[in-house]
Every structure is written in C-alpha cells, then in structure tokens.
Amino acid sequence: EMCIRDSTHTDWLRNRLQNCYKKGLPVLVSEFGTCDASGNGGYNSTESTKWLKLLDSLKVGYINWSACGKSETASAFNSGTNLKAIKSGTSQLTASGKFIRDWYRNH
C-alpha cells in the first residue's frame, strides 16, 4: 500500500514502486494527491501525470485524495462547496479536481 503526494514523492518513490512490481509484490496506491505531502502545496499536474501514466502502465489501482471542499490544494472541490448538492460540470471543482475528473474520464 502506498500514499503518494506528487510534488513530494517523485522519481525516488516511482523507482521503489517499479522495484516492488518487478518482484511480483502486490501494490495499491490507497491515496494520492496532486500537490505536496502537506496537502496544501502547489498543484503539480506534471508530476501527477507521470505518476498516473506509470500506475496505469503497471495496472496498479489508485484512489485520489481528497474529495472534499476544504480550502487546500489537494481538495477536489472549491472551498464552501456543499458536498450534498454537487452539480454536474466543473464549476465546483478546483484545478486538482478538474485534472482528476478529466484523467478518470479519459483513461
């Protein structure tokens, strides 16, 4: 089980993941975010794309963190969004939320 924060966990952790995979060890990314480990660093679509391409190529499952409306970079929804009344479209999504929505829809 791995937790990934794209701006913090870069090539060194991708290499570790690949080594585990080559050894036949089971791997699941139980949470990943599109920023640094604090959950509130800069949004990093470049590192996110590197991670998701690798995970898809290895057929490793992953779950995005965080589907909330907290005022932080990792949140999928804008601060103050009523999660009980989410509308379709992207108006309530953060940059991270839009990236993840598009990734899941296209992969």
Indicate where each model-derived feature is located.
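Extracellular glycoside hydrolase catalytic/binding regions
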Residues: 1, 5-61, 65-69, 74-106
